[in-house]
Amino acid sequence: MATPQLSPGVLTREVDLTVGRAENVLDNIGAIAGPFEIGPIDEPTDITTETQLINTFGKPISTDAQYQYWMTAASFLTYGGVLKVVRTDDDDLVNANGNRSHETVVTDLKIKSYDDYVANYAGVGQTFGYAAKTPGTWANNLKVCVIDNAADQVLGIGTTSGVSVGMGVSVSLTNQVIAGSGDTSSFTGHLKGIITGLGATTIDVKITQRVTTAGVSTDITYAQGDQARSILAGNNVSVINSSEVGVATAKIEGGNYAKDWYDEQTMGLTNSTVYWKSISPRPDTSNWAADRSSKNDGIHVVVVDDLGDVTGIQGNILEKNLNLSKAKDAVSSENAPQKIFYKDYLSIYSEYVYAGDDPSDGSDGFKAASDFSSGYTAITAASGGWNRNAQGITFNVIGNDTYTLTAGADYSATGGYTATLGNLITSYNLFKNKDEIAVDYLLMGPGLGDKAASQSKAGRLISIAGERKDCMATISPHRADVVDLSLIHI
C-alpha cells in the first residue's frame, strides 16, 4: 500500500497557498491636486484608468500649461494602482446655470460637489433653475428641456381677447355614450376643463371633469379622439370665468381646430427640431401620486448639446430623465425603492445637471400656470407647489420649457487654468490624515509661476509625507531652472 511517508516520522503534504490569501490588497496609491477642467471640487476621487480620468476630470488643456497636471496623473496610471485626484478650488470658478425664459442667471453660483448640493442647494428658495453638475465653462450653452402634462389639447379659437389662464372651458354633451366596464351608459351634461396656456389665437386646455345636468361632477382623464374625454371638431366651446360667467365662445370648425397638445410640442433647440413625442409618451400622474389622491406630478427632463460645444455634435441628446415626479416623497412603481423626485433623481443619476428653484411658484418672474381646483377657480401656486409630499395635491404645471446654461467660468475670467498656491495647499491638505485616507505617493505635478511658490508647494508635500510617515512625496523642480536653459561653457 502506498504511503506518503518518505522516511519514518516525515510526512510530505502539498498545500495550495492560494487558499486564504489576502485579496484586493491595495498598493501603489497616488494622490494629486490640480486645476482640472471638470469634476467635483476639493473631494478626493479614486481614478484607475486614463479613460476614467478624462470622464471625471476632463481632457488635458494647453492653456496655462494645465496639461502638465493631467500628464502627471496619466503617467502614474500607466503603472497601475489607484490615483486619488482632487480638483482644486478657485474664486473664479462658477457653475453654468439657467432660469426660465432666459432671465438673468446667477453669476457667482458654485456647487462644489454632491455633498455641497445636498447641504446648501437642494432646498426651496434657490435662485437658479438648473445648474451644471460641476463648475467651469464646459457646460456653457447646454440646454435643459423640461415638459410636464400642462395641457391635453390646444384649441385654435380665432381670438383670445378677454381670456386668461385659469379660466374654464365647457362643451355641452347630449346623450353621449360612455364606455364602462362591460357595459355602456348615456350621459347628458357638459365636459369641463381649465385653460393652462394662452396664445394670440389659441388656448391650451386640460380636461378635468364631466358634469351632469344635475350638477354631479366626475373626475376624468383625457383620451385623444374620445368625445366623452376630449374636445372634437364640431364642438361649441364656451370660456367661463371664475364667477361662472361666459366670456367667449367658439366652434371647432373651419379655421378653428382642436389638436393634441403633447403631439405639437417640440424642444426649444436652435439647430434641430425634435418633437417630445419622439422622446417619450407624455409624462402622466405617477402611480405614487395617484394612490395618494394627487395628480399632475409627472415631468421629463432632457439634456441636449444644442450647439455641439460639449460633444462636437449639434443637437446631441446627452441624457433622458423620464417620468420623474414633482412630489418630494415619490418612489418608482417599477424600481422601488428608487426615489423619482426630480431633484433627488437628477442629483444622483444625472451626469450633467442639478435642479434648483421650483419653477411653478412664479418667483422667477415667469407666469405660473395653474391647474383646476373647483368650479372654475384656478389653484394657487402655494397650494399646488412642488417639493412637497404627494397627499391630496394637484401639482402646478409649467408646460414645455427650455433652460440654456450660461455664466460658467474656469480659473480666471478669461478662461485660464492657473491654480494658486493657497488653493493647491488646501487640496493637498485633504491627504494629510493617514487614518482617513490611504496614500503611498504624493505627486507634486508641475511647479508654479515663480520659484518661491514652487518651493513652497514642494515643501508642503514633503511636510505632509513627514507627518504621515507612510508615504513618499515626489517633487518636481521649478520649470525655469531646468527647461530652455542656455548652455554655459566654462
Go through each PLM region and give its residues.
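Surface-exposed assembly/interface segments
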Residues: 1-488
